[in-house]
């Protein structure tokens, strides 16, 4: 199933998928959103780093590579300690409602980048990329952003 038209409908589908995944996990927070790899043909999403350390005010970028062309059907999520994941970016570069403009996304095809232009203390979290070009949607392994004091 390939998605070519993006918008509100896709945002809702992404959120529904995450909520269903959380519900099936039987946990409220601190889940590990791993790749749904293992089935032949599943798209593997590989994030550049498992950990990144930065300081308040710095610019930081996280990259994500898809194992095949996924057009611009990539979302980015933020999961703070003890909380459920929140959608930040959908369709590679569109900020979800209420997301601060310091968060941006870019890319298409196989290479994607998520950037925080000026890191704030509250940005301490794990960030995940996800493709929804094909079923099942698959996640990157996550990048934990640590803030230097």
Swiss-Prot record:
The mature chain has 12 additional residues at its amino end, due to a tandem duplication of 36 nucleotides after the codon for residue 36. Residue 42 corresponds to the N-terminal residue of typical kappa chains. Sequence repeats lie at residues 26-35, 38-47. CDD domains: IgV_L_kappa. GO terms for biological process: adaptive immune response. Pfam families: V-set (PF07686). Residues 76-90 are annotated as: Framework-2. Residues 91-97 are annotated as: Complementarity-determining-2. Residues 139-148 are annotated as: Framework-4. Residues 130-138 are annotated as: Complementarity-determining-3. PROSITE patterns: IG_LIKE. Residues 42-64 are annotated as: Framework-1. It comes from Mus musculus (Mouse). Residues 65-75 are annotated as: Complementarity-determining-1. This is Immunoglobulin kappa chain variable 6-17. One of its GO terms (cellular component) is immunoglobulin complex. Keywords: Adaptive immunity, Immunity, Immunoglobulin, Repeat, Signal. PANTHER family: IMMUNOGLOBULIN LIGHT CHAIN. InterPro entries: Ig-like_dom, Ig-like_dom_sf, Ig-like_fold, Ig_sub, Ig_V-set, IgV_Light_Chain. The gene is Igkv6-17. Residues 98-129 are annotated as: Framework-3.
């Amino acid at each position: 199933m390939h998605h070519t038209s993006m918008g509100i409908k896709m945002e809702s589908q992404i959120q529904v998928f995450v909520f269903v995944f959380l519900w099936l996990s039987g946990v409220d927070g601190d889940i590990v959103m791993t790749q749904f790899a293992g089935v032949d043909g599943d798209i593997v999403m590989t994030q550049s780093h498992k950990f990144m350390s930065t300081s308040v005010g710095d610019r930081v970028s996280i990259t994500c590579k898809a194992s095949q062309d996924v057009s611009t059907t990539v979302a980015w999520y933020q999961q703070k300690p003890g909380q459920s994941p929140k959608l930040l970016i959908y369709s590679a570069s569109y900020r979800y409602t209420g997301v601060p403009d310091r968060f941006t996304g870019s890319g298409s095809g196989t290479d994607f980048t998520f950037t925080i232009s000026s890191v704030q203390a509250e940005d301490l979290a794990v960030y995940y990329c996800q493709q929804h070009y094909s079923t099942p949607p698959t996640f990157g392994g996550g990048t934990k952003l640590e803030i230097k004091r």
